[in-house]
Amino acid sequence: MKKFLLAAAAAVSIAASAVSVHAQDWTPPGPIKLMIAFAAGGGADTQARLIAVHLEEKLGWEFIPEQVTGKGGVNLLMEMKDQPNDGTVIGMVVMESLGYNLYSADVGLTPEDFTAITTTAGAQMGIIASAATGWGSFEKMIEAGKAGQDIRFGVMSQRLGELAYLLGKAQGVDFNIISVKGGRAVLNGVTAGDMDVGFMAGIQGPGVAAGDLTILASAMSKPLNQDPDAPLLKDLGVDFDGDAIFMFAGPDDMPQETRDAIASAISDAASDETTEVGALIKRAFGGSLILQGDDLDATVLRNFNDSPILIKAASE
């Protein structure tokens, strides 16, 4: 999707203030089923569960976490769509779930069939190589590819695969794109030497710090925190980005008071770095990124509507 995070980041303060009614008197009518689209034990799953623990302790709400993985969050959306919209069922996904993944699944649904509640953070998505490759820069990788080396490029979603294809096309290199399940599988593949390079969404941090991994580029619409000088995809000939933003959503037509109360509670926890979850978000994702209300709705819908443009570009 074209550069949507820059616009989103600029709107954060406006969007946060859009939730003007904190609905402090609202309480869930029962336990909240928290559906999580990510594998147990990962950073995103931990983030969701820590938010639940914090809200249980602070507000007395009760959460029942449940893993609903598969198809980049679409399995969760399909299971959630007919659930009660009274705040007792919410799900943690990424914006791509309601955007590219929902569009490409072709299940007859759009983001308008759900309630976007709030975002929490954006992943530090980068193009990362093993230090053993000897590539100290993106240019060195391209030189190797043009010299005939088979560049094995790991991706963990169809959308990222299309970005890798467009990147290779723009640079005149035919990457050997390897699709795996999850960012940890990309990390493991690069570390083991089964891949040369791949998209990683923050999991690369310790390896980069230790000198085992090398950042070649930012796959976001903004610089990476760990290497602000790394080139962006737009600098490398790609008009799309790999922004990955964590968010909560619910079934369609959630009452405004309910949506506002849940959004306020979650965003307060995510943005407070003195909380365990806030500290995790700061450490793993560089800090919170809060979008709510009309700004969030517009950003999600734009992500969805830009999907066929990316698909068409990758098919040419």
What are these regions (language model features)?
Residues S17-A23:
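Sec/Tat signal peptide C-region and signal peptidase I cleavage site
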Residues K33-A48, T69-K71, F153-Q158:
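Extracytoplasmic "Venus flytrap"
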Residues M95-D106, G161-Q171, A192, D196-P228, ...:
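A ligand-binding cleft/hinge motif common to bilobed small-molecule-binding domains
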Residues W26-P31, L55, E79-T88, N101-A185, ...:
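Hinge/capping helix and adjacent helix->loop/strand transition within the periplasmic-binding protein
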Residues V74-N85, E143-K146, L166-A170, R184-M195, ...:
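Short helices/loops that flank or line small-molecule/ion binding pockets
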